[in-house]
Design a protein with these regions (language model features):
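Structural preference for solvent-exposed beta-strand-turn elements
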Residues: 1-138
Length: 138
């Protein structure tokens, strides 16, 4: 299996305003993607939910600056794999299935490990769908 990813046309600069729907799942994905950008990503009117707050806290725990204001949120990314966290950092995903399934893939190339925890409901879910492929990548 080839484990290399080749990006032919790398985006050098992207400055646009995107109107996102007030969707919890999209907001979590935005937070994770913004953590990988270089510089400031800003989202206005993020929905207020426990799952989104768990995602923002997770991004903070991996060493990315998050500034939450009344009507917007900024994430100041460090670029691809620009994580600054200690080995065995504990991240609480709360009840967010989206976060708990996407974050491990995002952090798979990190030299440090995380301990991903969640509430009772999340802890009962089957994660073999993500564990098996991640193990194949090493």
């Amino acid at each position: 299996m080839n484990k290399n990813i080749f990006i032919q046309n790398k985006i050098k600069n992207y400055k646009k305003k995107i109107d996102m729907p007030g969707d919890k799942s999209i907001s979590i994905r935005w937070a994770l993607l913004a953590s990988q950008a270089i510089g400031i990503s800003r989202a206005y009117n993020l929905p207020n939910s426990d799952d989104i707050n768990s995602a923002l806290n997770a991004v903070r725990k991996i060493g990315i600056k998050v500034i939450k204001k009344k009507n917007y949120c900024e994430i100041i990314g460090n670029g691809l794999n620009g994580f600054l966290f200690k080995n065995n950092t504990i991240i609480n995903a709360g009840n967010s299935g989206t976060l708990s399934r996407l974050l491990p893939g995002l952090l798979a190339k990190s030299k440090n490990s995380i301990i991903l925890k969640g509430d009772k409901s999340l802890s009962k879910r089957d994660f073999s769908r993500i564990i098996k492929p991640l193990n194949l990548f090493g």
